[in-house]
């Protein structure tokens, strides 16, 4: 599908009634499971990719080409739109961000996210003007071929400044971001404030892993148009592995060896080849 058609298709999933639930895959089989379940689009997760490779997230320990190859694999197997969680755009300058957007388009991605993180523990969030210029560069490079998400990580980085978050997301929308995103909003009121401030630009939400998570209908009623999970499905799967290994160490072989049959694994893999 040409980039412009893929863009229109992916954007339509954001603007329809109800919006889009877009889970994140971390390898070929997890992507095929999500496709088989009926999801209409999937995403990469920089944290999950890094973890599968034994590396840390957010420090470019996973290279841009490695991330692109991973995204191409997910798209090739599932034939679904793939959104790339490309951290800060893999570079310090707006030109670096533009180059990453172009590479994502050439790799057939449907969407790409650009964060305002810096990778500097002393100053984890980039200055306002710098952050906006980087999103602007991504939008200009996209040329209507890939959905650009402008993201601020204020909440994740321990900066619970809602006013600054709203200012950043509003500016991202004003320079043309197709979607905006602030992971881990502290509560429903903050989420509604974000949706209201940037309307009609669609808002993505990544909820924090807690017992206070809103349901999909509740998030959609609040005006959210896209729901992603980041690394949460991956960590859910790893929790099951950890539990099984503890059972095995305790002598419980049955608990450690029950799960998806390999016939089912092969069935899913065969679908990826069709």
Predicted regions and their residues:
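Alpha/beta enzyme core
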Residues: 2-205, 209-229, 236
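Extended, intrinsically disordered, low-complexity segments
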Residues: 3, 10, 230-274
């Amino acid at each position: 599908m040409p980039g412009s058609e893929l863009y229109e298709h992916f954007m339509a999933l954001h603007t329809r009634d109800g919006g889009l639930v877009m889970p994140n895959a971390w390898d070929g089989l997890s992507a095929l499971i999500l496709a088989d379940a009926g999801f209409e689009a999937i995403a990469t997760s920089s944290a999950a990719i890094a973890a599968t490779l034994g590396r840390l997230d957010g420090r470019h320990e996973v290279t841009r080409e490695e991330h692109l190859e991973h995204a191409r694999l997910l798209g090739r197997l599932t034939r679904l739109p793939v959104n790339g969680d490309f951290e800060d755009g893999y570079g310090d300058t707006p030109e670096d961000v533009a180059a990453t957007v172009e590479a994502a388009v050439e790799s057939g991605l449907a969407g790409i996210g650009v964060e305002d993180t810096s990778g500097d523990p002393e100053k984890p969030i980039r200055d306002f003007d710098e952050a906006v210029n980087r999103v602007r560069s991504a939008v200009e490079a996209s040329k209507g071929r890939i959905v650009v998400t402008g993201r601020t990580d204020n909440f994740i980085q321990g900066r619970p400044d809602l006013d600054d978050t709203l200012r950043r997301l509003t500016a991202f929308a004003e320079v043309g971001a197709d979607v905006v995103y602030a992971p881990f909003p502290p509560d429903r009121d903050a989420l509604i404030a974000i949706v209201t401030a940037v309307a009609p630009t669609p808002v993505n939400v990544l909820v924090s892993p807690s017992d206070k998570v809103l349901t999909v209908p509740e998030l959609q009623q609040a005006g959210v148009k896209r729901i992603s999970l980041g690394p949460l499905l991956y960590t859910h799967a790893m929790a099951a592995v950890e539990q099984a290994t503890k059972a095995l160490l305790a002598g419980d072989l049955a608990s450690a060896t029950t799960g998806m049959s390999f016939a089912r694994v092969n069935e899913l893999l065969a679908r990826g080849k069709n």
